[in-house]
Amino acid sequence: MEKQYVLAIDQGTTSSRAMLFDRQGKVAGVAQREFGQIFPQPGWVEHNPREIMTSVYTTITELLNNAQIDARAIAGIGITNQRETAVVWDKATGQPIYNAIVWQSRQTKDICTQLKEAGHEQMVREKTGLLIDAYFSGTKVKWILDHVEGARERAQKGELAFGTIDSWLIWNLTGGKVHVTDYTNASRTMMFNIHTLEWDAELLAMLDVPAQMLPDVRSSSEIYGMTQTQYFYGEQVPIAGIAGDQQAALFGQACFEPGMAKNTYGTGCFMLMNTGDKAVASKAGLLTTIAWGIDGKVEYALEGAIFVAGSVVQWLRDGLRMLGKASDSQAYAERAGDNDGVYIVPAFVGLGAPYWRSDIRGAVFGLTRGTTKEHFVRAAVESMAYQTRDVLTAMQSDSGIELKELRADGGAIANDFMAQFQSDILNVPVLRPEVAETTALGAAYLAGLATGFWGSREEIAKQWAVDRRFEPAMADDKRQGLYAGWQQAVEATMGFRIS
């Protein structure tokens, strides 16, 4: 049977999705299933790994049934995933020994403090391109081995496996036959040397993580193994692409040349700039990460991670009851006319790039008796754009590249007000693509290249198309005045302490 589709599994922080893409890179079917969040203590976030797998199986079945697709028409599977989230499981039974510790979780912050006090920061930065932070997988694995009785000894005997979510999915889909990850996910663990492209013995010793439990690190586009027959009605489908969600979005946005950048507006906000074959060391609070590894060549990116973006609108809806639904934020923001001097710094879990301050709380500034709900909503939406400018300023400083345009994706970019304000505050055109599902599309492209479904990156680049281009339309003095107000608000937030 002719191969007509590539299947992308997009395993995110709150839901799992399965999506079919045709040869034109258009969505041919989608299924989605949410799963539970576990909050054992304030600041801790965990997932049940078995529930994640169930959500993935369910979406695959729903997708094939609803789209009435024969599994033989699927050329391959691409996997993209919430990065940094760590799972440790028993190799013999396939059962997790503890919940998955999620990227957002701060439960390893004390370990991070100890590592910093021991003087490891410079070494970690040079080898991994990362900072010592609870965000990354390494301290999460250490925490599990420290807190589950007998776990470290079992890991040393080769009885336990560690993986980011991509590894966990592939292990299960192949019936425990394949234990791999790709360069992009490995580069987010704080255990992988992005220059030698190997697990680093010095980093593993620092964290006391046995090498026996680690997955093989492979390219982002190759055939890793075949699925078991029960998932695709008796057929075996090759798993042929892996990338962490933000790198997958960079690939799905066809940012193939150095200096091209994308920003994803989801729960958090993640801007990546392709730096080609150069691992650019950041002096401005950004991360150096692997963009992808294809055809024996690794390419790098600079990344700015903003912890709270779209979730500030969810907070207005669920926490403050200011909105009926998140999409109402556009109408409220437009109705306000301006922010009336109100700024929201949404440091609910501290601030990410370029500040990296986990010790501060969110704040609101500039309230008067004339402040309305509309002003509040507008300030929340504007905070996404201001934080993005913080990151872009750092990115241009590190790379020496002046951004010509910003390709944008994620749920919040559907908000026309936010997209236009982003263009205005950056003074750079913002491009919204026709296919909004760029993360899943990137995973599909990686799998399609490995299976011959698509012939080259040039072919993929021709498929990328603009839905709408937002051009800057704000006077420079107004732009600089608004941003100066934001900088003042951030500085004041950093000075506030709860005793």
Swiss-Prot record:
Keywords: ATP-binding, Glycerol metabolism, Kinase, Nucleotide-binding, Transferase
Activity modulation: Inhibited by fructose 1,6-bisphosphate (FBP).
Residues reported to bind glycerol: R83, E84, Y135, D245, Q246
GO-annotated biological processes: glycerol catabolic process; glycerol metabolic process; glycerol-3-phosphate metabolic process
Binding sites annotated in the UniProt record for ADP: T13, R17, T267, G310, G411, N415
InterPro entries: ATPase_NBD (IPR043129), Carb_kinase_FGGY (IPR000577), Carb_kinase_FGGY_CS (IPR018483), FGGY_C (IPR018485), FGGY_N (IPR018484), Glycerol_kin (IPR005999)
Annotated binding of ATP, by residue: T13, T14, S15, T267, G310, Q314, G411
Its EC number(s): 2.7.1.30
GO cellular component, one term: cytosol
Pathway membership: Polyol metabolism; glycerol degradation via glycerol kinase pathway; sn-glycerol 3-phosphate from glycerol: step 1/1
Family, per entry: Belongs to the FGGY kinase family.
Protein name: Glycerol kinase
Source species: Xanthomonas euvesicatoria pv. vesicatoria (strain 85-10) (Xanthomonas campestris pv. vesicatoria)
Gene: glpK
